[in-house]
Amino acid sequence: MAHKGKAAPAKPPTSHKKEVKSLKRKRGQEELSTLRKAIDEFDLKSTPKAFAELPLSEPTAKGVRDSHFETLTDIQARAIPLALKGRDILGAAKTGSGKTLAFLVPLLEKLYREQWTQEAKLGALVLSPTRELAVQTFQVLRKIGRHHLFSAGLVIGGKSVREEAEALSRMNILIGTPGRILQHLDQTHGFDVDNLQLLVLDEADRIMDLGFQRDVDALVQHLPTTRQTLLFSATQSKKVSDLARLSLKDPEYVSVHAEATTATPSTLQQHYIVTPLPEKLDTLWGFIKANLKSKMVVFLSSGKQVRFVYESFRQMQPGIPLLHMHGRQKQLARLDVTKRFDSSKHACLFATDVIARGIDFTGVDWVVQVDAPEDTDDYIHRVGRTARYEREGKAVIFLDPSEEAGMLKRLERKKVPITKVTAKDSKKKSIRDELQSICWKSHDVKYLAQKAFISYARAVHRATERDEKHNENSDQVFKFDKLDLEGFAKSMGLAGAPQIKFQKGEDVKRMKNAPRAPLSSGSEDESGDDKPRRRKKDEVRTKADKMFERTNQDVLSKHYRNLVEDGENDEEEDFFTTKRVLRGDELDEAAGGAGAGLPTAKTIDLGGTELVLDSKRREKLIKSKKQLAKLKGKGQKLVFDDDGVAHPLYTLQDEDDFKQQGPAEALRKQFVEQEGDKVKEADIDDKALAKQKKREKKLKRKARERGEAEGNGGPQLAGGDDDDEDPLEMLRSLPMAGTTRDSGDDESEDERPKKKPKKWFQDDSDDERKPKSKVIELDHEPDTLEDYEAIAAGLLDD
């Protein structure tokens, strides 16, 4: 009878779970093989119009659809199919044409088809020229890749390097700026890029312009050569072509607007206003007051100008929210400004070219360029902040009368349509008195005005030198001498134009791109010494001490104090000015010989450069070869003819002298014949030398064979006797290759000894020569121990 009790607990359906996982894995493999087959069969000649027509995976297609991207732009329709097939791409398209999706979609598909996991580490790398563009690209990636399981990271400057380093080893996709990524490659342990599948360079021309060329070159050397590379830019330059040649393999050049009639979107209306430099700020104020219900971006040439215009206009309250952005701001402040301006309906953003590339702001109505850009590519990228994705937009640029002709000629060459407009008199208003009042009340704004004026003047001066060097007079935009700088300074509220010290363009550019030095924490003495005053550890500080040590907490106070000190020093130095520098002998003549008894400075001529030894430090300079080499000119290679006359090693012949020698074909034949004769003469000598070497080799071989046949351990030469002369004497008398023997060499004292000196353990007798080996003949094979002992005794016996 069966036992009746409680039923046993049911076992968990583990087999069912395993079966479900197996089916899911199998279904995924089938979908992956179907996707790969669809990509291979996709016709590149077709022109898809929507994302649904592309062979995309389900997570990517769903992410694109949820982000409300449906229609393909021209660059997306041509670049995405090529990238899906694994081709390297060099893409060029107008700004605002959707290049970001053109490389993000293939990036996700590449990792999805490779079944990339977190253990495989970094699989895709995206380089952006600016932090703002990197942040925007990362946000788009999060939207369209929300249904994937990849881990993505953002690496830009202004954030903690240690926090970034801790998360880098877990990233599959990385977006950042070249400098910070190269820093992690050199310093971060565990950051591995050996398995990288895809490299993307966004706005490559801007990456080159910002001085990242060395960083990118060093970065590419770290990456594997089997990667796929996508390079996108709105404009192409020589640096971009060089980068493409080094980093791309058989690239596909995709240029959707190469044959377009205009280089800018057709929905963009472009205008220019001719206004003198002293009236630019008045025109800008009137333009802002006339468009209070608009969203605009105002570009200026430097960060100091941005700060001055923002601070002064903010105090004048135009009636629209004002924001400003430049490269010297902290990263969190830049992100906050970007977010606030993007979410605003009506706002005015003063900015430098830091946001001129790739940044997509929502609903920008106007792009205003107060200062002319350095080239037309910068103009195209600036106006690209509006009229994006087939939307309408407007742009205006303020030009000085001296800049009008050159800028219009450049824009016409780049196929940029632009029309001239004039500002209404009713909209014009002079704000010179208001700015002067603000500068009088606020020393900080006055300091900003001075620095803004200096930075603008230096930028125009540098651009003028570059235009004069590379462009024709008709194509020159910037003309420093024709600008009314005195009137411009007064229009900014200053009493006059500040003094400017111009430097070389490369030095200014290097200083501008250099990182900021850390702020000094020490305080200077009242006496003006640079060394910080040390305070004792146990010294008691009273309230009075703290009050006297307190300084203005305003960020501009220290800079303004330095500016005031510099101005006071300039005024003191202006009392005595240097008119002429007299040498020692000229000073004696001027003094009528009164100083003849005093010591004068010595002068040394260093190949055309005179070195005055007027101090001990200058005298020590003579002992340093490295320092003297800097003062001397570069050497020239000279050759001397038969008469002893020196000539340069390399001389160029002009065209007339070359034609006098005869036709080129006859000279070529003559040269070929002369070289042929030289080859024949050299061939005769080579054959004779080879024949002699062959004969010597044959004689040596025969002598060695004869010596082995005689069994005396070495060859015996004819006529030689061991007791009379050295058997090697005849060999020493033979001529050696590359040496000559004279009759007097035998009697010279430097002649090498014929025989090697004997060691202490060798016999001094020359008459007795020991044989090298001794042979004992045996009648029978030894069998017993006595036989072996007898053989050993015979060998030991001399």
Curated annotation (Swiss-Prot):
Organism: Pyricularia oryzae (strain 70-15 / ATCC MYA-4617 / FGSC 8958)
Pfam families named among the record's database cross-references: CTE_SPB4, DEAD, Helicase_C
Protein name, per record: ATP-dependent RNA helicase DBP4
This protein's encoding gene: DBP4
InterPro entries noted in UniProt: DEAD/DEAH_box_helicase_dom, Helicase_ATP-bd, Helicase_C-like, P-loop_NTPase, RNA-helicase_DEAD-box_CS, RNA_helicase_DEAD_Q_motif, SPB4-like_CTE
Subunit text: Interacts with the U3 and U14 snoRNAs. Associates with pre-ribosomal complexes.
Coiled coil: none
Keywords from the UniProt entry: ATP-binding, Helicase, Hydrolase, Nucleotide-binding, Nucleus, Ribosome biogenesis, RNA-binding, rRNA processing
Any single GO BP term: rRNA processing
GO cellular component, one term: small-subunit processome
Keyword match Nucleus: yes
Residue numbers covered by motif Q motif: 49-77
Motif (DEAD box): 202-205
